[in-house]
Amino acid sequence: MEAKTLGTVTPRKPVLSVSARKIKDNAADWHNLILKWETLNDAGFTTANNIANLKISLLNKDKIELDSSSPASKENEEKVCLEYNEELEKLCEELQATLDGLTKIQVKMEKLSSTTKGICELENYHYGEESKRPPLFHTWPTTHFYEVSHKLLEMYRKELLLKRTVAKELAHTGDPDLTLSYLSMWLHQPYVESDSRLHLESMLLETGHRAL
């Protein structure tokens, strides 16, 4: 009797348990990647703010020195310009390093979304036309994990493109108002929608990373 019971076990359970474990790992990875993104975003804003302050400071010095045309002031102007260029280059390199870090995070987000899509395709192959599929955890169908992952991915993909533009323009603009607008864009991340945190927390709750 016992042997017969063992013989009735289908291969579905181990396939789904592997899928559930992978999706749970992905949810934790999403959480960790977003935390790392926020840390880099804050660091990038500090650097961008330093770039803005440096440029505004130079503009103010230029206005003051326009009132003086002595040889001494000319020599001092060249010295200040050289120091400014060196400092600006250093800050721009720091901002580029931050962008490189954000790019690596976004690539990892793409892999998470791709993996979740693959799990959905595996489940479709496994169940075929069957409409009733048991949820891997509590209530979410597997496809919902992909929908949430894809939505988060698109937010951060667009945000990364915006930050690249901001970093490029910030180093070249001489307009203080435009500079402040770029800083605001970097800080407030307009493409990361307000419900992104809700999506993440819901996924963590569904997969058991948060207590019900």
Curated annotation (Swiss-Prot):
Phosphorylated by CDC7 but not by CDK2. One of its GO terms (biological process) is cell division. Component of the DNA replication complex, which interacts with two kinases, CDK2 and CDC7, thereby providing a functional and physical link between CDK2 and CDC7 during firing of the origins of replication. Regulates ATR-mediated checkpoint signaling in response to DNA damage. Part of the 55LCC heterohexameric ATPase complex which is chromatin-associated and promotes replisome proteostasis to maintain replication fork progression and genome stability. Required for replication fork progression, sister chromatid cohesion, and chromosome stability. It comes from the Eukaryota. It is found in: Nucleus. Na(+) binds at residue 202. Its main location: nucleus. It comes from Homo sapiens. The modification N-acetylmethionine is found at residue 1. GO terms for cellular component: nucleus. Residues 73-107 form a coiled coil. Homodimer. Part of the 55LCC heterohexameric ATPase complex composed at least of AIRIM, AFG2A, AFG2B and CINP. Interacts with AIRIM. Interacts with CDK2 and CDC7. Interacts with the components of the replication complex, MCM2, MCM3, MCM4, MCM5, MCM6, MCM7 and with ORC2-containing complexes. Interacts with ATRIP. Interacts with CEP152. Associates with pre-60S ribosomal particles. The modification Phosphoserine is found at residues 69, 73. The keyword Cell division applies. GO terms for molecular function: preribosome binding. This is Cyclin-dependent kinase 2-interacting protein. Keywords: Acetylation, Cell cycle, Cell division, Coiled coil, DNA damage, DNA repair, DNA replication, Nucleus, Phosphoprotein, Ribosome biogenesis. Belongs to the CINP family. Changing residue 184 to R: Strongly decreases interaction with AFG2A and AFG2B.
